[in-house]
Design a protein with these regions (language model features):
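Adenine nucleotide-associated cytosolic modules
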Residues: 1-217
């Protein structure tokens, strides 16, 4: 994935001179320049069922900032099966949502909320609908806060809670997320024991019917 001019208004890692460069190289150099004591490991590849387990192996926390349902389900399944906590963040126009899946016995996962992806074309992407330039940074800072808290064992994570941010109204709301007993990944009788049990296509579908487990806080 290469840096494009349209990327520059919503992040601080890449600059105008980086247009056309690989994002992984530009981002790694930015972090190294900011703090040369940080050990940056580059992964110049597309996440897939064949490599996701090796990619997350050895990490204490994963930050999911992906922009498509296929990869979100893949990251969820891999982290949940491996017992690695991870933060989920997504954005749309003027709104963002963030939660942390801690992987505990009572912790829900992404499939507890959304067992399957919405039909193709139902949710517009950011290229079509647009996104407020500062919104990714706002959501990303909250995710970074969750990562630091998790590593330090400090405070309370957004485990079992989803935070919704409305930039136009400058409001934060949260809803409770409940673990589902029939979740195909973290439920009592899981149907998914490996990322190779799922065909990560448009729907990321499995054979079990379930309803989203989100309730008003």
């Amino acid at each position: 994935d290469e840096v494009e001019l349209s990327n520059l208004q919503r992040q601080v890692v890449h600059g105008d001179d980086d247009v056309g460069r690989k994002k992984v190289d530009s981002a790694a150099e930015f972090v190294s320049d900011l703090n040369p004591d940080v050990d940056v490991e580059r992964h110049d590849l597309r996440v897939s069922p064949d490599n996701v387990e090796a990619l997350i192996d050895g990490y204490d926390f994963v930050v999911d900032g992906t922009d498509n349902f296929r990869t979100r389900y893949l990251v969820n399944d891999a982290c949940t099966l491996a017992g690695i906590p991870f933060s989920h963040g997504s954005i749309f126009q003027f709104e963002g949502q963030i939660t942390t899946f801690a992987g505990g016995d009572d912790s829900p996962c992404y499939r507890c909320m959304f067992p399957e992806a919405p039909p193709a074309g139902m949710v517009p992407n950011c290229a079509t609908a647009g996104v407020l330039g500062v919104l990714p940074g706002t959501v990303g800072c909250i995710q970074a806060t969750e990562a630091i808290k998790s590593v330090l064992g400090a405070g309370d994570l957004l485990d079992g809670r989803m935070v919704f941010y409305d930039a136009l109204k400058m409001e934060f709301d949260s809803v409770e997320i409940t673990k589902k007993d029939d979740c195909p990944v973290c439920g009592d009788d899981p149907a998914i024991d490996s990322v190779h049990d799922v065909e990560y296509t448009a729907s990321c579908a499995i054979t079990r019917d379930a309803e989203p487990a989100v309730s008003d806080d």
